Amino acid sequence: MNDIIINKIATIKRCIKRIQQVYGDGSQFKQDFTLQDSVILNLQRCCEACIDIANHINRQQQLGIPQSSRDSFTLLAQNNLITQPLSDNLKKMVGLRNIAVHDYQELNLDIVVHVVQHHLEDFEQFIDVIKAE
């Protein structure tokens, strides 16, 4: 594992920790715009770091050239570096990131809550798989 991947993993871990710290029990999330911004920004950062890692591995191992951020995870799954379910979940995160970054549509806070409560472990699972390589 090289410094690029090590640094990206550190970013993901830091962002997950920050999300967990600021989100707390979630009782204030829908009323607190600053809290929403913090959680969404850190989800974006997690997603970007995962994309960067995937692109780096795709390039290093010459797995192909992704045509989109989602394709980065597809290539990893096609080459059995991550599972298809993990690839699918990370591709959904890219969709959430795209909505948050580009304002394609209003971000549904219920989806953000669901991600925080049920899918932060997708980032952790991705880290574990990458570290095992």
UniProtKB/Swiss-Prot annotation:
InterPro entries: HepT-like, HepT-like_sf, Type_VII_TA_RNase
Highest taxon, organism lineage: Bacteria
Protein's name in the database: mRNA nuclease HepT
Impact when changing residue 102 to A: Loss of toxicity
Lineage of the organism: Bacteria, Pseudomonadati, Pseudomonadota, Gammaproteobacteria, Alteromonadales
UniProt keyword annotation of Hydrolase present: yes
Induction: Expressed during exponential growth, part of the mntA-hepT operon. Under control of MntA.
Post-translational modification, as annotated: Tri-AMPylated by cognate antitoxin MntA on Tyr-104; this rotates the residue nearly 180 degrees. Modified protein has much less RNase activity.
Gene Ontology MF terms: endonuclease activity; nucleotide binding; RNA nuclease activity
Outcome reported for the amino acid change (mutating residue 15 to R): Loss of toxicity
Quaternary structure note: Forms a complex with cognate antitoxin MntA. Forms a heterooctamer with cognate antitoxin MntA with stoichiometry HepT(6):MntA(2). Two HepT molecules dimerize to form a cleft with 2 Rx4-6H active site motifs in close proximity that probably bind substrate; in the heterooctamer 3 HepT dimers form.
Residues the record lists as O-tri-AMP-tyrosine modifications: 104
Record-stated family: Belongs to the HepT RNase toxin family.
Chain location of the short sequence motif RX(4)HXY motif per the record: 97-104
Description of the deletion phenotype: When mntA-hepT is deleted, has a sight reduction in swimming motility. No effect when just this gene is deleted.
EC identifiers of the protein: 3.1.-.-
Residues forming the catalytic site: 97, 102
One Pfam family in the UniProt entry: HepT-like
Function: Toxic component of a type VII toxin-antitoxin (TA) system. A bacteriostatic toxin; upon overexpression in situ or in E.coli inhibits cell growth. Cells swell slightly. Neutralized by cognate antitoxin MntA. Cleaves mRNA in a probably endonucleolytic manner; has no activity on rRNA, tRNA, ssDNA or dsDNA. The TA system confers plasmid stability in E.coli. Neutralization is mostly due to tri-AMPylation by MntA.
Organism in which the protein naturally occurs: Shewanella oneidensis (strain ATCC 700550 / JCM 31522 / CIP 106686 / LMG 19005 / NCIMB 14063 / MR-1)
Effect of substituting residue 70 to H: Loss of toxicity
Effect of residue 107 to H: Loss of toxicity
Keyword terms of this UniProt record: Endonuclease, Hydrolase, Nuclease, Nucleotide-binding, Phosphoprotein, Toxin-antitoxin system
GO cellular component: toxin-antitoxin complex
